[in-house]
């Protein structure tokens, strides 16, 4: 059946900002879908609020609406663009929920849904409808009951018994779900789940804790052809959300009979739900002893697991699902990797392991115990010839300084406690248990992880015990260790531990070289090497290979450049850096240079099979990078676009004289080394805050006293402001040093940076591109939040409202720094304007997280321009090549973009609602997971749109709760008076009430939690508070923390800085004005 010709305008709904449960995988699927629809001749219209995505680049759609994903905006686009059909299955839960809301409100008249019809979405997502559908086709389900109120939930639990699992309908990443072991826990979980479900429906089920969990990635076409793309096995048993579980593909502990039962059931489920053109994810649980199989749930859309399955098999699920949605059948679609029909089920001759990445260190008070509600921020994937090789490679990919199965404890009781408790380090504690002689059966009783996986870890521990210096001369032993996934660095560490002999990773590598032990590279080809692979998608392995290996060296023909990616998503290093790597690949294609991509993140566009000419799915470690450089014999290496991950490799790469292109290592070193950089700034006569670098705890005290408080402290070489704090006095410094030295040593190698804190300063981000001769000031972004809040967490906008004189000085100083440093490529500079003077805060000679936003806002693709500059060292030529709309002008000695006639604002998105116990107050340590963009004709309207897009909508009437810290009260009174004049009522606790009363501002006094009832929490729970303003800090009393927790729990919109309140007032004053709904292409005309 050929493509449909009765539709022409297709609207694709994106997933919005990166949040827990919905990350870069939907940029990958959305980008693939946009490209596919466009190549088929359809007119593609996209709505997505996330500017850091590749899919929102204007060339991927005919009209790109970077707007909040609301039913109202979608309806307006349908009318304006004359939409024939909507594809909602590429935008995660966000897209499905949006179309369901529109359907319920009668807003989809005359528009067809592609990929999944309303009935299919309802049956798949509504737990009651799903249960009825499963019973109809004879599927076994966990015993359960539905409830729509707290009373019904209590009736259900009396029937189900404890422990019980509570699940909410139409939620993302297990939102609102949990396991209750007693009635008190149950009542709280049931209330939370009812609140989380947009249709107030929850399912109370019998516990399946300890059962084995599997996922099937299924595709079905309009002719009822069905295929299994991949069967994914969860190592962690039921009770841990699959997004937080370590998973493997293909499944290793299923019998063929069980697999066939699951396969048949998956096909029957898709038919009954009504998914007739696209992909779905179906989850099962199997009792480890009785082998009873039950259906858990299904997603009638492309999911996080679909991205993993695509990368694990090389099968482009999103592309195939898109083609099926517009009329093709599986046998009409070609697999791009092998040129065989897409109806062939993929076959794997390797093992894939996925491990999630968490960020508990960023959120004090959040439990690291894993459960049915997802908590991970990102994930890594590794491919190996056997399970242990893949597992150890995955551990090495996590970017948390693990070289393999690191030992965490020798206390057996503490180890057992950690094995019982699902947590991100559980596998490492299991290895520790085996080191202390605990048996496989004993460990199984503690964690219910399948004995096969436990015996594999035990095997690895036994192999570790035998590592000594003799392996450096014994080819059989050393090859055996490499076959088990041991890195050179881990082998060196174990030799030191076992023999107390200092051996470096380089010496292990040298021994391998002498013994002719090197990895061979294999292809991910979807067909276990049965057909010729046309796209190089590679992984390394030391596993014995019966087939002739691809080899360790490539024939040198065309020019090649290696792009080192950013690894797993985590706070401080997210999708923005992957965006830059993808653009580097596109720019190399424009230069007719072959691109070689290295990354280990299965969610991203950079690891899609057709983004680069060659893809290596490997840990971003020096050992792996070196083997790829030797194999590919690249002409250049880009380390500047993947954040801190590749930058950390620059020193070792420079030592081996690897061909780093762009800004050289010596420049990176000057910018990263505080002492060298301070000297550099003094030579250029550029102001910076008073500072010092403490190489010991004693020196930290003396520097702090010399500078004077308040100070801001941070360790060197960190991203995302980790361990960064503002300290007001010597007591706070003492407490900080006592806490930080538990995890970080302060030494000459790892000094502590101490700066004078510029209170109430206006911060700015500048992105620039330099070719050693000329400079392009790509944008000056003004922060809304004042100094002291991490730049990644602050809202920022362009054009700036600062005076022309200050802006001229920023341009002049930026150009001076870029030219004198010798930057070739991108440069990010952070400034602060304090008491009308310009201070330099820091310089990063690499891509920054603001590059995608500025590229969208101003219409110049900065990462592409920078890549071209790094290759050709000609800024003028690069700007001319990419400035298609004549945006760039030359003025006052620098290139710069013409300022737009609109305001573009970037706002951060936080995971507080997913991480119970986290505090919403911001500081110098970054906490946001994603971003949204608001574009409008004024700052107020842009802010209004951005708040809507990041789930913090501005209400234009109602009761506002206000709690202000003492030092802010005088300034706050003026702002609160304006809120009252706009028609709001204020309610405050005693201290703020007195300050407002003294200033003549009317407010209603409410009780704190500790003062009795009814108190402020009661007002929030009753839905009486429309917004909350809270500028207290982390040092505030427990009452204030409980109030902030209540704000999150009750979905109250909140603002935590006075500078944000000022822009909020602008938004409220302008909110009655209509702002025309425009596509990015219209703004950039």
UniProtKB/Swiss-Prot annotation:
One term under GO cellular component: cytoplasm
Ligand binding (Mn(2+) 4): 842, 844
Reaction catalysed by this enzyme: hydrogencarbonate + L-glutamine + 2 ATP + H2O = carbamoyl phosphate + L-glutamate + 2 ADP + phosphate + 2 H(+)
Coiled coil segments of this chain: none
Region (Carboxyphosphate synthetic domain): 1-399
EC number(s) recorded for this UniProt protein: 6.3.4.16, 6.3.5.5
Protein's name according to its UniProt entry: Carbamoyl phosphate synthase large chain
Gene (name only): carB
